[in-house]
């Protein structure tokens, strides 16, 4: 019958006769690994529509929502994933990230409850897989940053840093250096980082943390600038500080050294990578 239709209509007829195949979990994961996130979102939505109890699809939809900065959607999906698979440390870790994002964006009266949920999710991830360094580092960061009323505390953070060091010497030592900086013990931080960089010159994260400490305290500025420039020659992975942060810290160092034109260049580079970060906007405005 189609042969009697105008040729221009044939593609339409054929497309109706052969509907597109719905995405599978494997299709969606392949798109995600390729960082084709918009397509991955659509694919995982197709998977969850066909399989409402697919915990892996729910997890990835929540992870994508975290990446987009959409806390309500992230929490919805990431609460459902561990409900379906309650023994997954990975699911609880990402749920903690979703609660943390929600706490950042929540009103004053909701922040504390969401922060506590964040801590609980991270702690559950660590309990399920004590060897998971990333989950421990998330819990370490929570304890380092959160106020005591929300369960935070530097001694709790130190305990996690020591546990991390048992499993990953570089990562754990970096965490201890971060604690020294948080306590404004900069000489101690520099000593720790000097030793780490001497023993592990390949550690880009150590270079970043050295530069960050220099930017914060105003000491060893030349070395701090060199360390950050070294970091900026690389492509950090998702578990390392983003490049915009390195540009920002380098800008702070150059500003302290009196090189305002150089600082402007670094702040502009940071803003190009992260145009909504308040600290960057303030720094760029200050040096106009």
What are these regions (language model features)?
Residues 33-34, 67-68, 101-108, 145-146, ...:
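Register position in tetratricopeptide repeats
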Residues 57, 91, 135, 172-174, ...:
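TPR alpha-solenoid repeat register
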Residues 29, 63, 97, 104, ...:
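Residue-level recognition of tetratricopeptide repeat
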Residues 18-67, 90, 288:
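N-terminal leader/linker segments that initiate helical-solenoid repeat arrays
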Residues 60-63, 94, 138, 175, ...:
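Canonical tetratricopeptide repeat
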């Amino acid at each position: 019958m189609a042969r009697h239709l105008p040729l221009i209509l044939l593609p339409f007829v054929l497309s109706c006769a052969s509907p597109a195949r719905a995405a599978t979990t494997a299709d969606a994961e392949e798109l995600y690994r390729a960082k084709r996130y918009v397509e991955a979102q659509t694919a995982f939505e197709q998977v969850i529509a066909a399989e409402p109890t697919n915990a892996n699809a729910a997890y990835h939809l929540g992870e994508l929502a975290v990446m987009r900065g959409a806390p309500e959607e992230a929490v919805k999906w990431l609460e459902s994933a561990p409900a379906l698979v309650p023994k997954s440390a990975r699911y609880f870790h990402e749920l903690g990230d979703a609660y943390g994002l929600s706490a950042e964006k929540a009103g004053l009266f909701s922040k504390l409850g969401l922060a506590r949920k964040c801590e609980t999710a991270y702690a559950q991830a660590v309990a399920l897989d004590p060897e998971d360094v990333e989950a421990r580092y998330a819990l370490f960061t929570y304890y380092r940053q959160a106020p005591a009323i929300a369960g935070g505390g530097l001694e709790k953070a130190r305990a996690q840093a020591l546990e991390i060091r048992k499993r990953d010497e570089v990562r754990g030592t970096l965490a201890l250096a971060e604690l020294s900086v948080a306590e404004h013990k900069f000489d101690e931080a520099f000593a720790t980082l000097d030793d780490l960089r001497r023993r592990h010159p390949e550690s880009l994260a150590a270079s970043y943390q050295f530069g960050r400490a220099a930017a914060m305290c105003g000491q060893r500025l030349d070395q701090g600038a060199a360390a950050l420039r070294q970091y900026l020659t690389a492509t950090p992975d998702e578990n390392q500080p983003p490049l915009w942060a390195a540009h920002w810290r380098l800008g702070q160092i150059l500003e302290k050294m009196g090189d305002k034109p150089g600082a402007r260049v670094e702040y502009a580079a940071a803003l190009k990578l992260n145009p909504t970060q308040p600290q960057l906007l303030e720094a760029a405005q200050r040096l106009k």
